Amino acid sequence: MISVSDLIALFRRALSEKWGYIWGTAGTQWTALKQENLEKTTDADRALERAYGKKWIGHKVADCSGLFSWAFRQLGGTMYHGSNTMFLKWCAYKGELKAGQRTDRAALKPGTAVFVWNGKT
């Protein structure tokens, strides 16, 4: 079983090693080739990474779920990388959340996740 203290120790390790943030990564070393490939993209969502990615060449990088995915692998477990994958694989209930709509907190349990999706894959 993976313990919280073991996960926290790995997160602290990533902090002490000064890992960077690059969307779509999970504890890998950022290379010049990866940066070159990123710079060839025109996706507006990746503009910031194209701009600051060079500073992470030679360093380990991860995104939010990638850090968890990496840590779980280090401890012998598995976890899907990416909130879209988690949503599509594990969502027990799908519905609409409208602006101003509230939910009774009693319906939420530890582990409940709320995802906002724009309707695109």
Enumerate the language-model features and the residues they cover:
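...with weaker cross-activation on analogous glycine-rich loops/strands in unrelated enzymes
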Residues: 2-9, 17, 77-121
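N-terminal capping segments
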Residues: 1-77, 118-119
